[in-house]
């Protein structure tokens, strides 16, 4: 039985608590060889992913987004739902497609940094000094079996990603919020964003921001400034997610 179907069955049979702890892997359909299929398209979906909704507009932005200058940014990491696990194990292009389906787009690097630093240029979303356990950024690192992850979307990769997954549900840490109300910008899952300045390397149009639940590579703590530019947008890793942005309704502005 394919894992996506098993997760749906788990929820339907009353295993809601167990299902809630299952990491929400790729939101994008994946074409698989016919022999790997289980009657439905060979896809791995987040089992309870809600369909796109039409959100009421508040201050020029949908009510589940935060207005900043001329743009809106999702309050939470995708799927932008408080109390849900963030999407992970996605490429930058998965994020682009998911946001486009919802009439949004992947945030740019500059938009993400501005949302994190706030109007006063903070080093961290919540202030200028790092505070332990405010954000989900100090979990222990677990040795990764990359050969298993390379088998995505088959079960060995999903099993390995599940073993590694240590993200909190969105909004679980009440103080991990920016001055303007954007949640979980540092820690939890790393977030794909589109480069604001083009790269000279083909395929490197995206970077990862915010680090993840086990901190940063070569940096003591996840900060608004830190950028992981080491991977192309096609890179798929267990700790990478994203959030969406959109243009703010015309005629509505706030301090940049």
Residue ranges and their predicted role:
Residues 1-11:
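Sec-dependent bacterial lipoprotein signal peptides
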Residues 14-30, 34, 38-48, 55-56, ...:
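Disulfide-stabilized, aromatic/cysteine-rich ligand-recognition loop
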Residues 50-64:
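N-terminal carbohydrate-binding accessory modules
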Residues 60-122, 129-131, 138-141, 147-180:
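Short aromatic-cysteine micro-motif
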Residues 77-79, 119-120, 194-198, 249-251:
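Acidic glycine-/aspartate-rich tracts in secreted/extracellular proteins
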Residues 184:
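Short, acidic, Ser/Thr-enriched surface-loop or helix-capping motifs
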Residues 190-191:
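Generic structural signal for well-ordered beta-strand positions
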């Amino acid at each position: 039985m394919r894992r996506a179907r098993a997760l749906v069955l788990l929820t339907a049979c009353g295993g809601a608590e167990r299902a809630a702890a299952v990491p929400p892997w790729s939101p994008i359909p994946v074409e698989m060889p016919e022999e790997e299929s289980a009657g439905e398209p060979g896809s791995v979906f987040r089992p309870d992913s809600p369909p796109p909704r039409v959100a009421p507009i508040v201050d020029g932005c949908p009510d589940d987004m935060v207005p900043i200058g001329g743009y809106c940014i999702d309050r939470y990491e995708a799927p932008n739902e408080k109390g849900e696990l963030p999407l992970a194990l996605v490429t930058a292009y998965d994020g682009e497609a998911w946001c486009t389906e919802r009439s949004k787009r992947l945030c740019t690097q500059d938009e993400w940094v501005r949302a994190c630093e706030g109007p006063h240029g903070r080093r961290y979303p919540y202030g200028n000094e790092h505070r332990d356990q405010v954000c989900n950024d100090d979990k222990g690192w677990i040795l990764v079996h990359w050969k298993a992850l390379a088998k995505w979307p088959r079960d060995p990769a999903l099993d390995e990603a599940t073993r590694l997954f240590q993200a909190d549900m969105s909004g679980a840490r009440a103080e991990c919020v920016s001055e303007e109300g954007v949640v979980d910008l540092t820690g939890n899952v790393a977030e794909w964003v589109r480069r604001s300045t083009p790269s000279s390397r083909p395929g490197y149009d995206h970077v990862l921001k915010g680090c993840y639940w086990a901190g940063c590579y070569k940096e003591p703590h996840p900060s608004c400034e830190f950028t992981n530019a080491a991977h192309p947008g096609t890179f798929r890793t267990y700790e990478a997610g994203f959030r969406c942005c959109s243009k703010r309704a015309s005629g509505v502005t706030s301090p940049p």
